[in-house]
Every structure is written in structure tokens, then in C-alpha cells.
A protein has these predicted regions:
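Conserved thiamine diphosphate
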Residues: 61, 69-74, 115-126
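Short acidic, glycine/serine/threonine-rich loops at helix termini
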Residues: 12-16, 116-119, 147-150
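Short, acidic/small-residue loops that bind anionic groups at enzyme active sites
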Residues: 24-37, 107-108, 114, 121-144
């Protein structure tokens, strides 16, 4: 698992990797503990994370967080087992997209997320790595109304400006998992 290595949705990637292989009850307990200080702006955010890590020591699963020095206000997630910091955000984004060959899940975000979307679209269009990987947009209202990038991408595909885009949009985590597993099974056929 790889992410931008920061808080929020990026951190969720690493919490998932940290808890992989554990029971649903243990994962639920860890998430309940983390709800005590859900934002990095909360005074006990880091302490709460360390409590979860102590209660549920990391097994052999690894994850890579790649934060950037550019966003000094966002701390790196403590759940990433490996950290690689970049000075240049565009190189950082390209590195993440190059490594993440199994698909990208786009949670509501800001400028960096927008950059990732269009960089991934170009990589998929040109089949830079020999195939296109799924672009999964999490949050229908956000990606079609508040930040209508999904509609723009659909329009560009319809006009022939982009090819090879495997896009989906959903509010369901189950749909996200199904999309990734389906892609993975087709890739190994």
C-alpha cells in the first residue's frame, strides 16, 4: 500500500495495511480508539495512534508513505512502516502513481489530488506501463458536484481526448474493493 503519507484518507491507507490480517473486532477496536482524535489538528492525534500501534503491533505487512517537504503543516502518518520524503511535489506525485499499479482511489482532496488525477489519466492514456490501472473516485457528490472532475474526465473520454481510462465512481467501500479485485484478476489472466 502506498499513499502521500499524510493524515486523513492518506493515513487510512496505512491504518488498513497496519491492521491487515487482524480480525474485524480488532480492526473495529483500533478504529474506535482512533476516533478519539481523528484529525492531526487534535492534541492527542499522535498519542492515540501510538496507543493503537502498541496494542496492535505491526505484523509483517508494510506500507510506504511519501509525504513532501512542501506541506510542512501536514505531519507524516505514524502508521506508514516506510517513509520517503520528496522536496518536489510533482516528482513525488509521479513516483506514487508509477508505483501504484493496482489502481488509485481518489478521496475528496485538494490541489495534489487534482494533479494525481490528471497525471494518472495521462499515464493510462499512453499505457506508460503497458496497461491502464483503475481510477476509482470515492464520493459521488464530491466528484460530480462540488469538484466535478469526474464529469470532465467522462467528457474528455467521450470526445476522444483520453483513451484507456478505467474509471468508476462510488460511495461504497465494497464497490471499491470489488473494482480493485476484478482488475487484479483480469491482470493475472
Amino acid at each position: 500500500m502506498i499513499s502521500g503519507g499524510g493524515p486523513g484518507a492518506m493515513e487510512a491507507t496505512h491504518v488498513g495495511a497496519w491492521m491487515a490480517g487482524r480480525s474485524d473486532e480488532e480492526t473495529s477496536d483500533a478504529l474506535t480508539m482512533l476516533q478519539e482524535a481523528p484529525s492531526f489538528k487534535d492534541k492527542l492525534w499522535l498519542e492515540t495512534a501510538f496507543q493503537v500501534m502498541k496494542k496492535y503491533p505491526n505484523p509483517t505487512y508494510i506500507s510506504l508513505g511519501i509525504p513532501t517537504w512542501l506541506y510542512g503543516h501536514e505531519p507524516a502518518t505514524p502508521f506508514a512502516t516506510h517513509i520517503a520524503k520528496y522536496f518536489d511535489n510533482s516528482i513525488r506525485e509521479d513516483s506514487i502513481l508509477t508505483i501504484a499499479k493496482g489502481g488509485i482511489i481518489y478521496a475528496p482532496g485538494s490541489a495534489g489530488t487534482m494533479q494525481e488525477i490528471f497525471q494518472e489519466a495521462v499515464q493510462n492514456h499512453y499505457l506508460s506501463f503497458g496497461y491502464a490501472s483503475p481510477m476509482i473516485f470515492m464520493g459521488k457528490d464530491y466528484w460530480t458536484e462540488e469538484m466535478p472532475v469526474y464529469r470532465l474526465m467522462e467528457h474528455l473520454v467521450a470526445k476522444g481526448k483520453y483513451k484507456n481510462l478505467l474509471m468508476s465512481i462510488t460511495d461504497s467501500t465494497e464497490d471499491i474493493v470489488e473494482t480493485i479485485l476484478e482488475f487484479r484478476s483480469k491482470k493475472t489472466e
